[in-house]
Amino acid sequence: TFIAIADLTSLMDPIMFHQPLDTCIEFCTMEDSGRLLANACEDSVPEEFWRRFYNIGGGERCRLNYIELQQRSFDVLGMGKLEDLTERNWFATRNFHCHWFEDSDVLEGYLRFRSQGVDEYLQQVQAALPAWQRIGARVTPAWLVKRFVLRPLARNHPDSTMYWLDHDR
C-alpha cells in the first residue's frame, strides 16, 4: 500500500521499476490518509481500537494492478502508452510489498476516512500538473521521454533494477 499524492511527477524515481507489473496495489489518497489521522485523534475512537496493527488502504475503489496504475497515470500525464515508454525487462518480476488488504476495512470501520478512489485520485493528478508539463508531455514524442527520462532512470541510477543487473549487484 502507499499514500497517493497529486504531484505524481515528483515520484519519478527508480522505485517505479521495483514492482512487477502484475502487482496488486491498494493505495490511500493523501486526503483520506489525513482524515484517518484526524479521526484517530477524536475522543469517540473506542478503546478496542488501540494497541492493534492495521493496514491502511483505500478499499475496493483504490485497488488495481500496477500496470493499470502506470498506464492510467501516463494517460493523465499525457505521456502515451506504457509499452512505448518503457521496456518490460526494466520492471522487477517478483518480491515487492504491495497487496490488496482485506483487513483495511476494519480500520475504515473504526475511523470512517475513505472518500476517494482511483478516478478521483487521477483527477487530482491532472489538476496538479503545471500547464507547461501538460503541453510539453503532449508534444514530446514518446521515444524522447523513453530515451532521456525513463531509460536513464531504469538503467543509470544506483537504485534501479537494470543498474543492479548491469553492475552485478
Task: Say what each PLM segment does.
Residues 1-21, 79-83:
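A short C-terminal helix-loop "cap" of Rossmann-like NAD(P)-dependent dehydrogenase/epimerase domains
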Residues 2-4, 29-33, 74-77:
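Short linear motifs at secondary-structure transitions and domain/linker junctions
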Residues 3-5, 15, 25, 56, ...:
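Weak global preference for isoleucine
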Residues 7-15, 24-54, 59-61:
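Alpha-helical substrate-binding/gating segment
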Residues 20-24, 91:
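Short coil/turn segments at secondary-structure junctions
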Residues 39-110, 116-139, 147-169:
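Mid/C-terminal beta-alpha module of Rossmann-like enzyme folds, strongest
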